[in-house]
Design a protein with these regions (language model features):
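Alpha-helical adaptor scaffolds
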Residues: 34-102
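A conserved position within tetratricopeptide repeats
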Residues: 26-27, 60, 94-95, 128, ...
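Alpha-helical segment of the N-proximal tetratricopeptide repeat
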Residues: 1-45
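"A position-specific structural signal for the A-helix of alpha-solenoid helical repeats
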Residues: 4, 38, 72, 106, ...
Length: 155
């Protein structure tokens, strides 16, 4: 009940109420990956990337079969200006989740930011193959791909 309420508050943009709902969850359950995922969302909404990194790392450690932990950890690293680390760690997640469009997409973003334009294009193509035209539209508006589009790679 509290987890669902926290998710609802987070979707409404009220991170304080979401946090209060999570605090009402029994202490022994607060480390559950579902709870951690919402907690990550709360801290991401207020750009507390150090906390997001801790939570994302815990998610990967507790449940490596859940792809969102890999995404959350690498995104926090990227936001902390540790994009090379984000890229390398997310490549580990790709070994387990090679059919997840968001992993391919984020790897493409990080590759582009790192100046690896050929890799970025290939990874973005794979993300589009998996996720369709919506992925392509999102990429066209993503500032992480600016270097790819400036170099004439727009398709």
């Amino acid at each position: 009940m509290h987890l669902t309420a926290a998710q609802g508050w987070l979707e409404l943009g009220n991170h304080e109420e979401a946090f209060e709902e999570l605090e009402q969850i029994e202490a022994t359950l607060r480390g559950h990956p579902d709870v951690l995922e919402v907690r990550w969302g709360i801290y991401a909404s207020i750009e507390k990337w150090d906390y997001c990194l801790e939570i994302g790392s815990a998610m990967v450690r507790l449940d490596p079969a859940r792809f969102t932990g890999w995404i959350n950890r690498s995104f926090a690293l990227h936001c902390l200006k540790r994009t090379e680390e984000a890229y390398e760690q997310l490549k580990e997640g790709l070994r387990r989740h090679d059919e997840e469009e968001l992993i391919w997409y984020n790897l493409a973003c990080y590759a582009c930011v790192l100046g690896k334009k050929f890799e970025a294009r290939k990874k973005l193509e794979k993300a589009i193959d998996i996720g369709g035209d919506g992925v392509k539209a999102r990429a066209l508006d993503d500032p992480d791909f600016e270097g790819l589009w400036r170099s004439g790679e727009k398709k």
